[in-house]
């Protein structure tokens, strides 16, 4: 298949063997974004580059954008905002914790006390959390239980031996936190996306239509045609999927945080439910997280990972996403190739569906 850029500044033609309908989104880090590297992924079947702003500043993100556009204007660019999240902070060194140990969590950055104290980035943390609540740190690798509430901190019991590091995610399944949908950093990156004519903004932890409307208002005020993709990562987002689909261009089923906020065994059912809703609404849907996680360290995927990709294709998803596999994994080109081959092999069983193809600002993604 011959692919030619549509931009006015370059005429780059690359021959790639990409006959699939399902698009591949690859997360790219500024630490590995050389033109030669990106060209290999493009030849392997990458259609969209994802920038994760939780781990990049604007200078780093711009480096990726510039190199992507040196490869081909046919590669769409998606920027991923942090959204309303809580993270550990103010940790000079990692903290080792043992099972059954007592530690303390606070949202007060000025609080100091004896014992192992961890600060988090949400000032009302002690106020909003109840005794008995589970607190999951670092994508669920560390599990804590609230045993006592104080005015400015929580006493926690550690349920598994682990190491807690700075800037790691903090989740409280089922809790309703009074978090702003857009942080100052999110707003700055939305402006960055507009200034650099990016294609998609994927907003994290979308809970309702208001979260989508807040971004759309910024885009409309600046006359931008960037499309908003709502990342569904908690129960509130699942419950409000109908109103979210009324306002978002499309949806990403972000199974990482979703599997922390909701019991893991429910995720396949929720994935199928959201994909069905998107098909009914004629809105594109992306399936994300750990699709080829084994290939971060190993050259071959597991059979379960192959089945996961195939099942996403069977459901009728528009795009499938790689995260660590391409951002820092040892076998990024191989991961894209595997994803493309599995998609091509299994797309023939999916009935054609008009009107849901993932479309960027100017044209359909090729």
Question: Which positions does each model-derived feature cover?
Answer:
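Non-catalytic helical/linker scaffolds that mediate oligomerization, partner binding
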Residues: 15-366
């Amino acid at each position: 298949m011959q692919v030619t850029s549509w931009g006015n500044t370059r005429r780059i033609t690359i021959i790639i063997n990409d006959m699939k309908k399902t698009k591949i989104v690859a997360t790219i880090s500024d630490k590995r974004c050389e033109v030669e590297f990106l060209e290999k992924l493009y030849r392997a079947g990458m259609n969209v580059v994802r920038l994760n702003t939780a781990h990049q500043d604007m200078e780093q993100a711009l480096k990726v954008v510039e190199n992507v556009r040196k490869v081909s204007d046919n590669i769409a660019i998606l920027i991923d905002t942090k959204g309303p999240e809580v993270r550990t902070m103010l940790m000079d060194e990692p903290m080792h914790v043992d099972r059954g140990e007592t530690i303390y969590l606070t949202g007060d950055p000025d609080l100091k006390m004896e014992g192992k104290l961890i600060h988090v980035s949400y000032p009302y943390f002690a106020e909003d959390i109840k005794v008995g609540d589970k607190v999951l740190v670092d994508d669920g690798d560390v599990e804590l239980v609230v045993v006592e509430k104080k005015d400015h901190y929580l006493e926690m019991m550690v349920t598994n031996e682990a190491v807690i590091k700075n800037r790691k995610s903090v989740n409280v399944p089922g809790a309703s936190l009074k978090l702003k949908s857009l942080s100052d950093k999110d707003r700055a990156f939305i402006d960055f996306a507009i200034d650099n004519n990016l294609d998609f903004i994927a907003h994290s932890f979308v809970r309702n239509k208001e979260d989508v409307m807040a971004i759309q208002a910024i885009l409309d005020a600046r006359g931008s045609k960037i499309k908003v993709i709502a990342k569904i990562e908690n129960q509130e987002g699942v419950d409000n999927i109908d109103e979210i689909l009324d306002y978002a261009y499309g949806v990403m089923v972000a199974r990482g945080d979703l599997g922390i906020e909701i019991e893991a065994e429910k995720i396949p059912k929720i994935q199928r439910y959201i994909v069905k809703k998107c098909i009914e609404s004629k809105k594109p849907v992306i399936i994300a997280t750990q699709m080829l996680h084994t290939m971060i360290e190993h050259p071959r995927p597991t059979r379960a990972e192959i089945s996961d990709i195939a099942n996403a294709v069977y459901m009728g998803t528009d795009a499938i996403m790689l995260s660590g596999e391409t951002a820092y994994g040892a076998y990024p080109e191989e991961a894209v190739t595997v994803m493309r081959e599995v998609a091509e092999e299994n797309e023939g069983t999916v009935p054609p569906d008009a009107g849901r193809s993932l479309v960027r600002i100017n044209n359909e993604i090729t």
